[in-house]
Each structure stands twice: as C-alpha cells, then as structure tokens.
C-alpha cells in the first residue's frame, strides 16, 4: 500500500505537469516547423496520459475513503461504547487545541 502523503505529492506533480503542458500547447509556435509539430503531438499525448493517471488516482482515493468509512461504520456498530469513547476523546483533543489559539 502506498503512502498517502506520497500519493498527494504525486497528484500535485501530475496536476502541475498537466497545467504546464496545457500552457505549452496554448503558446504560439510556428506550425510549419516540424519540431514544433512533433513536440506538440508528444505534449498532447503526455497530457492525455497525465489526465488518465490523475483520474485513476482520484478513483483510487475515493474507493479507499469509502472502504475506511465502511470499516468505521462496522466498528461502531460492533462496539458502540468504544466508538463513543473515541469520539469523545477526539472531541476533547480538538477542543483543547482550538482553545489554545
């Protein structure tokens, strides 16, 4: 299983790459220049690949979050008093942290 912080960094990098490629594709260049045409084609292909990867990563995050919600729901139904205790503890910690500000 991959690290959530690493996944986030990868998503940020892919988003930045996507934005950069879109900017390059919008920029002016001599369409008659063969290198420009080749570069534009490669950039469009790379942009499509990046968009697919970002979409897949987004789907993966959604699936993992949904699974975590189901596990938490099952846990609370199996052990309601422990769930209440955890909720109270989290609320207490958040209250203390917010009160310090």
Swiss-Prot record:
Keywords: Acetylation, Cell inner membrane, Cell membrane, Membrane, Transmembrane, Transmembrane helix
Pfam families per UniProt: DUF883, DUF883_C
Regions crossing the membrane: 80-99
Subcellular location: Cell inner membrane
Highest taxon listed in the record's lineage: Bacteria
Chief place of localization: membrane
N6-acetyllysine: residues bearing it: 35
Membrane topology reported for the UniProt record: Single-pass membrane protein
Cell inner membrane as UniProt keyword: yes
Cellular component aspect of the GO annotation: cytosol; plasma membrane
Subunit structure: Upon overexpression binds to ribosomes.
Family of this protein: Belongs to the ElaB/YgaM/YqjD family.
PANTHER family in UniProt: INNER MEMBRANE PROTEIN-RELATED, PROTEIN ELAB
Name of this protein: Protein ElaB
């Amino acid at each position: 299983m991959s690290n959530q912080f690493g996944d986030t960094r990868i998503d940020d990098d892919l988003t930045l790459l996507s934005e950069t490629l879109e900017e390059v594709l919008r920029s002016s260049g001599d369409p008659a220049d063969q290198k420009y045409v080749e570069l534009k084609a490669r950039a469009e292909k790379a942009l499509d690949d990046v968009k697919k990867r970002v979409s897949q990563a987004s789907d993966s995050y959604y699936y993992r979050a949904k699974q975590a919600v189901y596990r938490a729901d099952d846990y609370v139904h199996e052990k309601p008093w422990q769930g209440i205790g955890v909720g109270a503890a989290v609320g207490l910690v958040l209250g203390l942290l917010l009160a310090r500000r």
